[in-house]
Amino acid sequence: MLNGYGYNWYRLDNQMRADDLLVRSRASELLESAAARLRDLEGRYRRKYLPPPTREHPHPDPQHLAAAQHYRAVADRILEIDTRLRGAPVPPDDKIWLRQRGEIETLQRLGNCDVVLVARAKELVETAAGLPADVCIDPAIEQEIDKHLGRLAETLTRRDEILAVLR
């Protein structure tokens, strides 16, 4: 890692490690934007259907309150996957085993998984962007969001399996 003048930025493995972090941060940004869209829709829904309490109506309508909380639950599921993505491990930089394992090959496989993560996160963002405002989440759309989240979780699991060989 260190040469006579400092860190060697030009080695392929160092570039691939940096690219891995950049691509995963892009996927994380996409997931955060999908969750932000859902939080925005929740706020709009609350403003429209859950007015401030009055003497005549001190409690909000339970159906509208449940729908607003449903937006929050879906956004939280997206953020769980985002947390898992941000906390995903990277290959250890073990000098002893560096010659024995194919680090470049491993980093390429991780890079491929990360590209798939970005593509699936984009699909999720497109689904969230297509949600209509001021109505509760349709169960079919929620299933589609959960399907996207399941695919993201599968890709993260595949990424963990690639790294499990190195431990």
Regions found by a protein language model. Name each.
Residues G130-R167:
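Preference for long, well-ordered alpha-helical segments
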Residues M1-P53:
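Leu/Val/Ala/Ile-rich N-terminal alpha-helices, chiefly Sec-type signal peptides and the beginnings
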Residues R37-D138:
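Charged linear interaction tracts used for macromolecular binding and regulation
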